[in-house]
Structure formats: structure tokens, C-alpha cells
């Protein structure tokens, strides 16, 4: 190795690439000084980030543990096996594949394993809280398959299981997807199982948003009821950004393994798999159950206070971490609301609501989630303060004095509940 090469690989980020180091520093400052209410985001532990930023980044490992196409895999084999065993223990599954790079990749692998192009699938309409990968026409799931979308009841804004059953009886899907990206109520997986059995369909649960709540036992588990379960490993699970597939029947295992590799991916990201293993280990600890209980209680407190302030919440409340505001109650679009809360350092996202008259680029809703701020230590009282800041900003959009007051209150909350307070990120040294 030349002196110049040795020197270059031993430089820290700040010395090697000050432009990227500075931008990472700015992002850390943003996370520390803003209230993160995007429902799909959370704050991973330092241990998770240390694993992901390790020398495992260097290792290629196509295949499965003990069945690799490359040498030198003895240590990544042990890491991946540990991740698999922890995932199985955490969710009570018979089998797990920890290699999917994302939840979308996990869903695609399931489709590849169980379906043929042109088969019929059923999934929750995106505008009613579903996900792009559940049959949206802009996603491969909507291009390859005949999609029948179910929705929520117009009055209750909850899933109508009898209406879903009638759709299934009419269309005889080969696969039914139950899962969501913006549905604030408990999913009845047993009822979906009964419908799937009645029409002879496979049942896929996408629990990406509620995986941490399921792991902690504060939301019913889909694993006993579904042929296959997919999830991301971040969101409420608080791990690295990645995917996971679980199932209860070993007969399906080989199909799903092959659908991941070589069917839809090449080499796994072993540094991310190590970070997943760390996150699964954290979720197996008693403290994670307490955390998840607080996530749900905090969401209820947030929803109740916003309703009391005159802002409608879809379905009238929440059973999980998601609070979806229907801003038609205050004559505002989601796009405008997103901008208003952003300028007081609250991060959320505009979102469609059921039967939304606005386009997906405008929307009538604002989606909030409690996982990230609960990680920072926010309790129900703090979330009521957050709700008041949001309400004050949305109900007084033209008042500069209110805007400045909201900024000061957000700053005080951030100082009261610091993020990564012990030290700056070591990667920047």
C-alpha cells in the first residue's frame, strides 16, 4: 500500500471530506433543534449507528449464512445468524430473513415468491392510509398485478371488515395485504385471516409502522395469523433503515429466501444487518416495552389535545403512534399546514385523508407520529404542549407574534429533552 493510500483511508471524515462533514453536522443540529413528528421516523441508538458505521461496510457476502459465494464470511455469518435468531425471538416467528434493504424490497420479494404477473391482489387504498407497495398504480405492485383496493368507512373512518370480505368474495384475490402507512387504529389480523381463508388467498401483513408496538406487545401481532409478515426495521422499532421478512411456516422459507437472493437483491448489507441485530437486542429488553407503551399513550394525549383545540383527527383518535389531522375542520390544506409547522421547527408531513377532495400534492391532512419524540423522553404532558404549539400556529397563520412565540416554545422543549446529549457524533472527528 502506498503512503498516500494508507494516509487516505486513515483520515476521519472531517479531514477527508469537510463538505460532507459540515452537512452532517448541520443535519445533526437540525435534529437536535426541531421537533420530529414524522410518523415513519425515529432516533436510532448510538450502538445501532456504531454497528452500521463499522468495518462490516467492507464485506461482501452473497448468499445465506454458511451458504456464501465468497470467502471470509465466518464473522458476518455469526452476525447474520444472531440477527435472525433475535428477530424470531422478538416476533415469535419460525423463520426470518434479515437481508431486505427496505420494507418495499421485502414486499417485492413476497410478491415475487407467491404471485405471477396478472394475479389479483387486495390492499388498502393509498389515500385511505395504505402504502405505495400495496397496489398503487405508480408502483410495480400496481403495474404487475390486478389490484382491488379496499378503503375505510366514510362515517367511522375505520376499516369495514364486512365490506372488505364482500370485495374479496367478488374478486377472489390470490393475496390480501393488511397494513398501512397512515391508519391510526388497531388492525384485526384474525378477521383478515378469516377472509383470506374463505377466498383461498395468501395473507401478507405489512407491519412496518407498528413493528415496535407489536414487538412490545402493545399491538396485536400479525405473525400467528398471516402467511408472511414484512416490516421495516426503523420507525417504531427504532433500528437502522432496512427491511425484514417473517413467517410461521417453514414450507414458505425457501421461497422467500430465493426471492430475496438471487430473485431481487445481490449482496446483503452486513453492516446494516449488524445494526438490525443490535436494534432487535434492544427491543428484547424490558425498557423497550415501557417505551412503546409511552409511544401509544403520548399519541392519545396529542390527539385529545388537538381535538380539544378544534382540529379534527381522522377516526376520532388513535390506537397506535399515528395521529392524522383532517384540516378541513379549520379550512386549511395539508400543504399549507406542513409549511406553517415547519417554520416553527416542527417536522411533519402533509397527507391525504379518507375521501380527500385535494390532490396528493396538496392534501387535506397532516400526519403526526410520536415515536421519535418519545425516544427523546417526551411524556404525555410534553405532547400536550406540542399539540398547543401546533394548534396555535395553525389557528393563527398570519400572526407573526404567535409564530415567534411558538418558535421559543419549541426551542425550550428541545433544550428540556436533548438528543444525543452526551457528545457530538464521533464520525466527525
Swiss-Prot record:
Q: Which of UniProt's keywords are assigned here?
A: Amino-acid biosynthesis, Cytoplasm, One-carbon metabolism, Pyridoxal phosphate, Transferase
Q: Kind of enzyme, top EC level?
A: transferase
Quote the EC number: 2.1.2.1
Segments crossing the lipid bilayer = none
Q: Which residues bind (6S)-5,6,7,8-tetrahydrofolate?
A: 126, 130-132, 359-361
Query: Quick one: which pathway?
Result: One-carbon metabolism; tetrahydrofolate interconversion; Amino-acid biosynthesis; glycine biosynthesis; glycine from L-serine: step 1/1
The protein's job, in short, is: Catalyzes the reversible interconversion of serine and glycine with tetrahydrofolate (THF) serving as the one-carbon carrier. This reaction serves as the major source of one-carbon groups required for the biosynthesis of purines, thymidylate, methionine, and other important biomolecules. Also exhibits THF-independent aldolase activity toward beta-hydroxyamino acids, producing glycine and aldehydes, via a retro-aldol mechanism.
What quaternary arrangement does the UniProt entry report? Homodimer.
By which gene is this protein encoded?
A: glyA
Q: What is this protein called?
A: Serine hydroxymethyltransferase
Amino acid at each position: 500500500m502506498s503512503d498516500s493510500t494508507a494516509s487516505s483511508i486513515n483520515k476521519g471524515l472531517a479531514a477527508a471530506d469537510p463538505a460532507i462533514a459540515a452537512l452532517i453536522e448541520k443535519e445533526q443540529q437540525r435534529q437536535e433543534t426541531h421537533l420530529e413528528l414524522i410518523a415513519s421516523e425515529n432516533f436510532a441508538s448510538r450502538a445501532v449507528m456504531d454497528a452500521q458505521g463499522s468495518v462490516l461496510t467492507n464485506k461482501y457476502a452473497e448468499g445465506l449464512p454458511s451458504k456464501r459465494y465468497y470467502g471470509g464470511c465466518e464473522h458476518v455469518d455469526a452476525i447474520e445468524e444472531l440477527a435472525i435468531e433475535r428477530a424470531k425471538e422478538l416476533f415469535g416467528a419460525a423463520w426470518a430473513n434479515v437481508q431486505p434493504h427496505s420494507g418495499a424490497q421485502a414486499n417485492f420479494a413476497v410478491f415475487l415468491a407467491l404471485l405471477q404477473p396478472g394475479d389479483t391482489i387486495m390492499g388498502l387504498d393509498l389515500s385511505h392510509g395504505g402504502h405505495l407497495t400495496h397496489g398503487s398504480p405508480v408502483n410495480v405492485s400496481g403495474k404487475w398485478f390486478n389490484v382491488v383496493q379496499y378503503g375505510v368507512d366514510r362515517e367511522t373512518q375505520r376499516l369495514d371488515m364486512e365490506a372488505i370480505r364482500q370485495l374479496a368474495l367478488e374478486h377472489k384475490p390470490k393475496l390480501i395485504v393488511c397494513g398501512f402507512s397512515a391508519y391510526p387504529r388497531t388492525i384485526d389480523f384474525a378477521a383478515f385471516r378469516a377472509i383470506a381463508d374463505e377466498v383461498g388467498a395468501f395473507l401478507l401483513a405489512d407491519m412496518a409502522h407498528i413493528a415496535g408496538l407489536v414487538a412490545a406487545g402493545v399491538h396485536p401481532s400479525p405473525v400467528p395469523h398471516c402467511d408472511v409478515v414484512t416490516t421495516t426495521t426503523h420507525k417504531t422499532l427504532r433500528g437502522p433503515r432496512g427491511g425484514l421478512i417473517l413467517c410461521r411456516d417453514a414450507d414458505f422459507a425457501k421461497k422467500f429466501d430465493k426471492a430475496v437472493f438471487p430473485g431481487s437483491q445481490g449482496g446483503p448489507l452486513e453492516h446494516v444487518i449488524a445494526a438490525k441485530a443490535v436494534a432487535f437486542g434492544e427491543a428484547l429488553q424490558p425498557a423497550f416495552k415501557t417505551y412503546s407503551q409511552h409511544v401509544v399513550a403520548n399519541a392519545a394525549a396529542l390527539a385529545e389535545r388537538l381535538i380539544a383545540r378544534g382540529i379534527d383527527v381522522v377516526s376520532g383518535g388513535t390506537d397506535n403512534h399515528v395521529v392524522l389531522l383532517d384540516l378541513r375542520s379549520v379550512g386549511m390544506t395539508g400543504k399549507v399546514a406542513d409549511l406553517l409547522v415547519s417554520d416553527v421547527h416542527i417536522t411533519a408531513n402533509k397527507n391525504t385523508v379518507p375521501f380527500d377532495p385535494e390532490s396528493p400534492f396538496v392534501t387535506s391532512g397532516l400526519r403526526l407520529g410520536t415515536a421519535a419524540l418519545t425516544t427523546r423522553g417526551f411524556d404525555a404532558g410534553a405532547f400536550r404542549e406540542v399539540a398547543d404549539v401546533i394548534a396555535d400556529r395553525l389557528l393563527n397563520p398570519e400572526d407573526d407574534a404567535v409564530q415567534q412565540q411558538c418558535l421559543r416554545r419549541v426551542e425550550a422543549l428541545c433544550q428540556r429533552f436533548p438528543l444525543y446529549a452526551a457528545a457530538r457524533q464521533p464520525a466527525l472527528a
